[in-house]
């Protein structure tokens, strides 16, 4: 219907703004035109990002707002305008309202802010961090209070967070640590008693920790599978969560033509080709992000630490939490500017090597 169409348009705008902000972040961090152009090209080749247009959720707007927060914090370190910190603080807090896991990105910004504070002694940065924490607490309370007043009912605490950690240590329906209905099953069984559910979750964590202790090979295998099925899954569930859930029988001729392409993308030969392309792209981004990290770790620039710290923090968090490859997708997309710069570094090294070799050959011929 019309509402769905409008949501898809909003999703499309989110993707456009994500690519734009990746470009802006690349420009402000590296000030290199070749890197900037490469970021735009790579973003367009990130097929999971395109497929997520059909997944109406807080993922894409949360990614855009996180990048906006990154950008204005980095810009503040260069231009020292207080309003930039205000935009950054508001953006990251709205991003957290969309997806709670975006708190990791706030902490990544804080890590860079602390380094910057030690180096520059800028009190505005302290105010920025305090404001972020205040906004995070106040916005949540404001939303809860609003709905309690409107509904005339108190909002329950919901599923205890520890249940997601317990589930992250169990074998899942899909793979190690993935969703297995653990928390949803025990909630009605324990009559929604959060204290009892918390105790059961703690017991489950202790039991699984004991299993891992007695079977170290299994523990390594479990967390290896959990890592691979999140960070090395090339589609990041983009084809799974956007796959059509309808019956393809009794179609008109026009629907058959349209659905031929849908079937190819999601179920047939083209699906395997797309998955392979996404895998190549994923390997490319990871490899050249490592090249970036190796070449710039000695540079004492706090702005270069935000994205790597967020990626490391996200990795640690999602190895503890319930697993899904779509959870880690934002961290991967945010690596694109680093990978682009890593490729430029390699290109420059090759160019320099060839130039030096030619100069040596010329000297040898004289």
List PLM regions with ranges:
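Membrane-interface anchor segments at the N-terminal boundary of transmembrane helices
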Residues: 2-11, 225-307
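Multi-pass, polyprenyl lipid-linked donor-dependent membrane glycosyltransferases
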Residues: 6-14, 38-68, 73, 82, ...
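Transmembrane-helix motifs of polytopic, lipid-linked glycan transferases
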Residues: 9-30, 65-68, 287-292
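Transmembrane-helix signature of polytopic, membrane-embedded enzymes
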Residues: 22-45, 303-307
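Short hydrophobic alpha-helices at membrane interfaces in multi-pass membrane enzymes
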Residues: 34, 40, 75-93, 123-128
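Membrane-interface alpha helices of multi-pass inner-membrane proteins
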Residues: 84-99, 131-139, 315-316
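Transmembrane-embedded, aromatic-rich helix segments that form part
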Residues: 100-116, 127-128, 339, 343
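Membrane-proximal stem/loop segments at transmembrane-domain junctions that anchor or position
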Residues: 147-254
């Amino acid at each position: 219907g019309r509402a769905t169409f409008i949501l898809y348009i909003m999703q499309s705008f989110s993707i456009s703004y994500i690519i734009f902000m990746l470009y802006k972040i690349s420009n402000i961090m590296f000030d290199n035109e070749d890197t900037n152009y490469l970021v735009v090209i790579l973003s367009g080749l990130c097929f999971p990002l395109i497929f997520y247009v059909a997944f109406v959720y807080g993922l894409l707007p949360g990614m855009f707002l996180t990048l906006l927060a990154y950008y204005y914090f980095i810009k503040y370190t260069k231009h020292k305008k207080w309003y930039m910190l205000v935009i950054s603080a508001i953006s990251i807090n709205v991003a957290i309202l969309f997806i709670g896991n975006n708190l990791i990105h706030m902490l990544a910004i804080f890590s860079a802010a602390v380094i910057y504070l030690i180096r520059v002694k800028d009190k505005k940065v302290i105010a920025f961090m305090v404001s972020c924490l205040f906004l995070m607490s106040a916005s949540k309370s404001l939303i809860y209070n609003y709905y309690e007043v409107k509904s005339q009912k108190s909002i329950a605490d919901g599923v205890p967070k520890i249940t997601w950690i317990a589930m992250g240590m169990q074998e899942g329906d899909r793979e190690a640590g993935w969703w297995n209905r653990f928390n949803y099953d025990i909630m009605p069984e324990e009559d929604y008693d959060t204290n009892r559910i918390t105790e059961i979750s703690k017991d489950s964590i202790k039991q699984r920790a004991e299993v891992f202790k007695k079977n170290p090979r299994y523990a390594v295998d479990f967390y290896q599978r959990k890592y691979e099925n999140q960070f090395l899954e090339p589609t990041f569930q983009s084809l799974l969560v956007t796959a059509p859930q309808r019956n393809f029988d009794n179609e008109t001729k026009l629907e058959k033509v349209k659905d031929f392409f849908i079937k190819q993308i999601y179920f047939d030969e083209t699906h395997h080709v797309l998955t392979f392309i996404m895998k190549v792209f994923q390997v490319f981004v990871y490899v050249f992000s490592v090249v970036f990290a190796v070449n710039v770790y000695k540079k004492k620039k706090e702005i270069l630490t935000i994205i790597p710290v967020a990626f490391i923090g996200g990795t640690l968090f999602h190895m503890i939490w319930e697993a899904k490859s779509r959870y880690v997708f934002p961290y991967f997309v945010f690596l694109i500017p680093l990978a682009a710069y890593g490729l430029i570094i390699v290109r420059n090294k090759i160019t320099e090597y060839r130039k030096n070799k030619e100069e040596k050959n010329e000297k040898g011929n004289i």
